[in-house]
Amino acid sequence: TVKTNKRTISADEFFKGLFTTALQDGEIITAVSFPVAAKAGYAKFPHPASRFALTGVFVAKTAGGDVRVTATGASQNGVMRVPGIEAALKANWSAGAIDGVKVPADGLLNDIHGSSGYRANLIKVMAQRAVAAV
């Protein structure tokens, strides 16, 4: 949750795209809050030269059982949630639970570093690695 000098915005509503947020003129972020994760992990597949994430995935599970999975470096819109993997991990927090999940390639980057299909697969693999590391 993002708190500003004027309002409170959920993270899903705050991030509008790559380098774009829901902030209005004169609005300043005053606080950011999020539930403490009981389990969390991050794995990235770095670009060999820059070391930036070609695809990076963060997985988190709260004590109450809520699960969030986000990917960076793969989407045309910046950070994205991965609902299919979230649902699989909510049912069974294990790397194997992700095996049957198909991550859609729609909206993913397609460039000289990797096709959108390749990035969709990387999201899945990095999510499995992040869960396995917890």
Report residues per predicted region.
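C-terminal structural segment of proteins
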Residues: T1-V134
